[in-house]
Amino acid sequence: KGMAILGAHIDSPRLDIKQNPLYEDTELAYLDTHYYGGIKKYQWVTLPLAIHGVIAKKDGTIVDVCIGEDENDPVFCVTDLLIHLAGENMEKKANKVIEGEALDILVGSRPLKGAEKEAVSKQILSILKEKYDMEEEDFLSAELEVVPAGKSRESGLDASMIMAYGQDDRVCAYTSLVAMLEVENTEYTTCCLLVDKEEIGSVGATGMRS
């Protein structure tokens, strides 16, 4: 009787795209986001970002989305002020320099030819239609997440470390799973629990509290 249990969480801080996200401001197109998990908001500005997720279209089909990971893909960013315009911001505490509502991602600046109003937003919609056969209403049934773009890399001259998004807590998730699969002659049944929602309090049907 008994069980040997290993546990880790597999969710990481990120930006989630809202359900009605596309808007235009000063001839620039943005996607409205809200942050998920415990993030240092000032670290997310002027950082190359990628969009991952799925779009559930009205006809029931599912479209996988991954923009920003291939070297030929465009990337996205959260904008920031130039240093000589940011004097007031630089005097704020770190948790106030960038507010959560300022973490919207810049997605375009080129207007659609012939469009009179919100021409940049319309250009973005035309690209989404061309590449993903996506309408603006499809954002309502999409799950799209924004994360730092780029693959994991070895770090240090001795390559003794790994630099990558999401090491908290996937480094523990990977080692826990491998340990369970490779252990021999165990006294107890082995179990590995990999859960999400830890970043927001372990709530929900797939969090540890369930």
Label the predicted regions:
Residues 1-210:
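N-terminal hydrophobic/helix-forming segments and targeting peptides
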